[in-house]
């Protein structure tokens, strides 16, 4: 049995997940982070992307986060995000429409805020594609 630790994923609106996991993977601003039980304490910013965590039965779950912070303590890991959406709740058509709108607007102007929005939509789309490829394989 692999060592486990408590993982909390919290958005500005609600708690998305709270439970025991074997590992968690997030996109930090300095690169990808893999966290396992006993990891060194850490506080870092995370960028828009995927949080992937593995449960004891080796089931993987995916959550899109818009960025935020990761805090690693001896027995608990917390992901704080402005926006967090479970992978299976992402809507591909809405994501693609928002991505196209951001690309179109960005092509007409050079705006850092729009560039950030485009990066968030691309990150959402990646999470959606990963979740759906996993669901397709299970069928």
UniProtKB/Swiss-Prot annotation:
By its UniProt entry, which InterPro entries does this protein fall under?
A: ATP_F1_dsu/esu_C_sf, ATP_synth_F1_dsu/esu, ATP_synth_F1_dsu/esu_N, ATPsynth_dsu/esu_N
Which keywords does the record carry?
ATP synthesis, Cell inner membrane, Cell membrane, CF(1), Hydrogen ion transport, Ion transport, Membrane, Transport
One GO cellular-component annotation of the UniProt record comes to:
plasma membrane
Q: Which compartments is it annotated to reside in?
A: Cell inner membrane
Name the principal localization, coarsely classed: membrane
Give the GO molecular function terms.
ATP binding; proton-transporting ATP synthase activity, rotational mechanism
Q: Which domain of life is it from?
A: Bacteria
Give the matching SUPFAM superfamilies. Answer: Epsilon subunit of F1F0-ATP synthase C-terminal domain, Epsilon subunit of F1F0-ATP synthase N-terminal domain
What's one Pfam family the UniProt record gives for this protein?
Answer: ATP-synt_DE_N
The record's function comment reads: Produces ATP from ADP in the presence of a proton gradient across the membrane.
HAMAP family reported for this sequence: ATP_synth_epsil_bac
Describe the protein's quaternary organization and the partners it interacts with. Answer: F-type ATPases have 2 components, CF(1) - the catalytic core - and CF(0) - the membrane proton channel. CF(1) has five subunits: alpha(3), beta(3), gamma(1), delta(1), epsilon(1). CF(0) has three main subunits: a, b and c.
Into which family does the record put it? Belongs to the ATPase epsilon chain family.
Q: What is this protein called?
A: ATP synthase epsilon chain
Q: Which source organism?
A: Haemophilus ducreyi (strain 35000HP / ATCC 700724)
Lineage of the source organism? Bacteria, Pseudomonadati, Pseudomonadota, Gammaproteobacteria, Pasteurellales
What gene codes for this chain?
atpC
């Amino acid at each position: 049995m692999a060592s486990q630790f408590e993982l909390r994923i919290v958005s500005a609106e609600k708690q998305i997940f709270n439970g025991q996991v074997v590992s968690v993977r997030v996109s930090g601003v300095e690169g990808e982070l893999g966290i396992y039980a006993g990891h060194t304490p850490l506080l870092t910013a995370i960028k828009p992307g995927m949080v992937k965590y593995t449960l004891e039965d080796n089931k993987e779950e995916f959550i899109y986060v818009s960025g935020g912070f990761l805090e690693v303590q001896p027995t608990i890991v917390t992901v704080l995000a402005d926006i967090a959406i479970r992978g299976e709740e992402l809507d591909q058509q809405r994501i693609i429409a928002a991505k196209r709108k951001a690309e179109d607007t960005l092509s007409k102007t050079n705006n850092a805020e729009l560039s950030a929005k485009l990066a968030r939509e691309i990150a959402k789309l990646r999470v959606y594609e990963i979740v759906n490829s996993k669901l397709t394989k299970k069928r």
